[in-house]
């Protein structure tokens, strides 16, 4: 039996993912002690999904101040447990690396005269098991992305300098969190053949950038949906191929997500048209946006073409949030800059589309699916 200790440092989403990975991949007896550090106890009191895990809850200050009655395998919430991780009960305490260390019982800890500050060196004379764990670290843990940045482009823009200026602003952020940039391209358009310029960019940023191929060209919708399918449990930031970010924008956006991980946030927000006799409003966001996991209602792709002209992805996503009762809010301290005339082009497309009637027709055709207790703040 091993007792995992997880310290919640006000990043509820990371702790949630770590708990899920333990449940999925640890095929041995274990217990979990969750130590709350933050004032509002977000894991215990807010995230319902964690309640299905059997955890003991402790105040972090209390457990470190008072006597520790059992060994704890403290895990860094920035990692996940992978594979069928096998572990044996360990009698002697140890500390190693910055991702996993043992917090020993108080009586044992006095013998070692070690601090709990990280990082620390491996203790001399560790057991064979500890040696194995250290050498095979890659077999049982891996880092995960805190969020994914997803964008798409098309054949008339993939060669533009503006596209690569935007991409450089995505990868060169000052951000304390792990993220990856996903460039979604359609096989229908490119046939899995990357232009030389894009191939060179991906190669020069291969630790940060990945190409995601999807067969069908769903135009602007493919900046989000294929990435959601590949990373269903990860928050996703969507950007356009001409968005130029300030160096701290992604950090600001993700911090806002951590404070309110159940809402969609965007740097521009507006109200869609209301429907007569219905007391609600549908909100849509544009520009720099972050989408939490499971925030969109699953409407068929055909609805995007029939009711939204195959171009109004922001509006389609708005009704998908509406039917999932996902709050949609504005983040005010981010303002991405457009590098070309895409906003003008989209404004004309929007003006030429009979959006009010399309929206009204969509709602009337999906009344049975409309949540009865629909509320927006």
Name each model-derived stretch.
Residues 14, 55-65, 215-222, 310-311:
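A short, glycine-/small-residue-rich helix N-cap motif at loop->alpha-helix starts
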Residues 113-148, 152-153, 157-166, 304-377:
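C-terminal catalytic/acceptor-binding lobe
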Residues 70-80, 233-242:
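Short beta-strand-to-loop acidic/aromatic patch adjacent to the donor-nucleotide binding site
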Residues 61-71, 224-235:
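Active-site nucleotide-sugar/metal-binding loop of Leloir-type enzymes
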Residues 20-29, 166-179:
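Short, acidic, metal-binding catalytic loop of nucleotide-sugar glycosyltransferases
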Residues 6-16, 38, 151-165:
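Active-site beta-to-alpha loop of glycosyltransferases that engages the nucleotide-sugar donor
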Residues 36-43, 185-198:
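A conserved acidic beta->alpha catalytic loop
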Residues 81-126, 227, 244-306:
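Conserved catalytic core of nucleotide-sugar-dependent glycosyltransferases
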């Amino acid at each position: 039996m091993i007792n995992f200790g997880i310290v919640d440092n006000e990043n509820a989403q990371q702790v949630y993912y770590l708990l899920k990975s333990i449940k999925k991949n640890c095929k041995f007896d274990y217990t979990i002690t969750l130590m709350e550090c933050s004032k509002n106890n977000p894991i215990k009191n807010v995230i319902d999904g964690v309640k299905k895990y059997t955890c003991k809850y402790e105040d972090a200050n209390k457990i470190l101040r008072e006597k520790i009655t059992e060994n704890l395998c403290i895990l860094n919430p920035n990692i996940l447990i992978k594979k069928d991780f096998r572990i044996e009960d360990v009698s002697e305490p140890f500390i190693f690396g910055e991702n996993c260390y043992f917090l020993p019982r108080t009586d044992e800890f006095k013998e070692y005269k070690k601090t709990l500050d990280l990082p620390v060196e491996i203790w001399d004379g560790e057991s064979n098991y500890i040696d194995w764990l250290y050498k095979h670290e890659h077999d049982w843990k891996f880092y995960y992305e805190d969020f994914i940045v997803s964008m798409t482009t098309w054949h008339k823009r993939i060669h533009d300098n503006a596209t690569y200026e935007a991409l450089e602003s995505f990868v060169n952020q000052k951000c304390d969190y792990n993220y990856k940039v996903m460039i979604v391209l359609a096989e229908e358009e490119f046939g899995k053949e990357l232009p030389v310029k894009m191939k060179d960019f991906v190669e020069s940023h291969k630790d940060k950038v990945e190409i995601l191929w999807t067969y069908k060209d769903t135009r602007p919708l493919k900046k989000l949906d294929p990435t959601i399918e590949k990373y269903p449990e990860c928050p996703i930031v969507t950007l356009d191929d001409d968005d130029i970010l300030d160096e701290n924008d992604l950090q600001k956006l993700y911090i806002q997500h951590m404070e309110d991980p159940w809402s969609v946030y965007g740097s521009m927000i507006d109200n869609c048209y209301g429907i007569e006799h219905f007391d609600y409003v549908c909100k849509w966001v544009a520009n720099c946006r972050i989408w939490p996991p499971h925030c969109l209602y699953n409407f068929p792709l055909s609805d995007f073409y029939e009711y939204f002209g195959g171009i109004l992805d922001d509006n389609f996503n708005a009704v998908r949030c509406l039917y999932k009762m996902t709050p949609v809010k504005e983040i005010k301290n981010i303002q991405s800059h457009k590098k070309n005339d895409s906003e003008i082009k989209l404004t004309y497309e929007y003006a030429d589309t009979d959006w009010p009637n399309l929206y009204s027709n969509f709602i009337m055709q999906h009344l049975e699916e409309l949540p009865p207790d629909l509320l927006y703040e």
